[in-house]
Curated annotation (Swiss-Prot):
One of its GO terms (cellular component) is virion component. It comes from the Viruses. Keywords: Host-virus interaction, Hydrolase, Inhibition of host innate immune response by virus, Inhibition of host interferon signaling pathway by virus, Interferon antiviral system evasion, Viral immunoevasion, Virion. This is Uncharacterized protein C129R. Its main location: virion. GO terms for biological process: symbiont-mediated suppression of host innate immune response; symbiont-mediated suppression of host type I interferon-mediated signaling pathway. It is found in: Virion.
Length: 129
C-alpha cells in the first residue's frame, strides 16, 4: 500500500532537513538501526521518512528481490498508527540521515581541529612575509 504524499514547500523541506546529512549512495547500507532518515523519491517527492528498522533489507517487489531500507514511524509497536514500510534503494534519489551524538561530537572535534589548523597556517603565513 502506497502512502499518500504530503506536499511540502521547498522552505518546509529545507526546515525538515536541518541537522540531517546527505548520505552518498555507496554508504546507504551502513545506516544503522534506529537512525532517523528522510528521503526524496526518484520522482523528486520529499518524504519525511522514519526510523531505520532494518538496513539493508531484501524486499520482494513484483517477484523481484530488491535491496531496500525498512522503516518505522515509531519504536512503540503497540502504539495506534504504528506502521513499517520498505523503500527500495532504486526508488530513492537522495537519502538524508540524522547524526547521533557520537557523530555530532566527531564533527565538532573535526571543526575545532580545522579551525586551529587554519589559525596555524595564518600565523605561519604572517611570519613568512
Amino acid at each position: 500500500m502506497e502512502h499518500p504524499s504530503t506536499n511540502y514547500t521547498l522552505e518546509q523541506q529545507h526546515e525538515k532537513l536541518k541537522n540531517y546529512v546527505l548520505i552518498p549512495k555507496h554508504l546507504w547500507s551502513y545506516i544503522k538501526y534506529g537512525t532517523h532518515v528522510r528521503y526524496y523519491t526518484k520522482q523528486n517527492v520529499f518524504r519525511v521518512g522514519g526510523f531505520v528498522l532494518q538496513n539493508p533489507y531484501e524486499a520482494v517487489v513484483k517477484n523481484e528481490v530488491k535491496t531496500a531500507i525498512r522503516l518505522q514511524n515509531s519504536f512503540n509497536t503497540k502504539a495506534k498508527g504504528h506502521v513499517t514500510w520498505a523503500v527500495s534503494y532504486d526508488d530513492i534519489s537522495k537519502l538524508y540521515a540524522k547524526p547521533d551524538a557520537i557523530m555530532l561530537t566527531i564533527q565538532e572535534n573535526v571543526e575545532k581541529a580545522l579551525h586551529a589548523l587554519n589559525q596555524n597556517v595564518l600565523t605561519l603565513a604572517s611570519k613568512i612575509r
